[in-house]
């Protein structure tokens, strides 16, 4: 199941920054895909520290320690998930500034892609270098043995899609999954059904 996280709601802001993602975690045996996540809280909020005020956190200031504390919280949360059997795959699709510009122009110049355009994207583009610095520090601080980051070059979509598909297939393969076991009674029913169908 895929979940896209948008701007936090007032209910989200009444909880810790991890809460809304915790609610969307897949149950055991399922795959969950997060488009954005609690990592926004060490990216967008770091680039725009005024957003911390809306979170009503006592005694917090947009200084380096706030972000390091959040990195620690994220690492502890992901370690908890990994210890409980969740395979975590974190993918950063790295798009260059030039390619980002080309994609925005494509959305602007093609009416069939206007639905993808958001003025906020152009506004945020002026912070490209700030985001790059925040991404680099985030990846360095939160790439762990139990929840590593994979930085995938994404200027060419076919390259990124192939890399991501290969990565996910490899991760699933490493889980050593098997078909569900069937009882002796089910085996007998299967054999009986096969004989019946073959006799038709």
Task: List where the protein language model places each region.
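Flexible, compositionally biased loop and terminal segments
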Residues: 1-200
């Amino acid at each position: 199941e895929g979940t896209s996280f948008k701007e936090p709601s007032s209910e989200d802001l009444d909880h810790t920054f991890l809460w809304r993602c915790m609610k969307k975690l897949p149950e055991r045996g399922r795959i969950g895909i997060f488009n954005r996540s609690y990592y926004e809280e060490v990216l967008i909020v770091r680039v725009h520290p005024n957003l911390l005020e809306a979170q009503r956190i006592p005694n917090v200031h947009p200084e380096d320690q706030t972000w390091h504390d959040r990195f620690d919280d994220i690492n502890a949360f992901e370690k908890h998930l990994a210890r409980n059997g969740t395979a975590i795959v974190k993918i950063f699709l790295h798009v260059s500034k030039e390619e980002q510009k080309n994609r925005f122009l494509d959305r602007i110049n093609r009416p069939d892609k206007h639905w993808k355009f958001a003025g906020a994207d152009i506004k945020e583009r002026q912070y490209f270098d700030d985001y790059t610095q925040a991404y680099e520090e985030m990846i360095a601080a939160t790439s762990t043995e139990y929840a590593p980051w994979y930085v995938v070059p994404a200027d060419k979509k076919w390259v990124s899609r192939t890399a991501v598909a290969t990565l996910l297939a490899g991760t699933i393969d490493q889980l050593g999954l098997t078909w569900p076991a069937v009882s002796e009674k089910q085996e007998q029913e299967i054999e009986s059904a096969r004989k019946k169908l073959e006799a038709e």
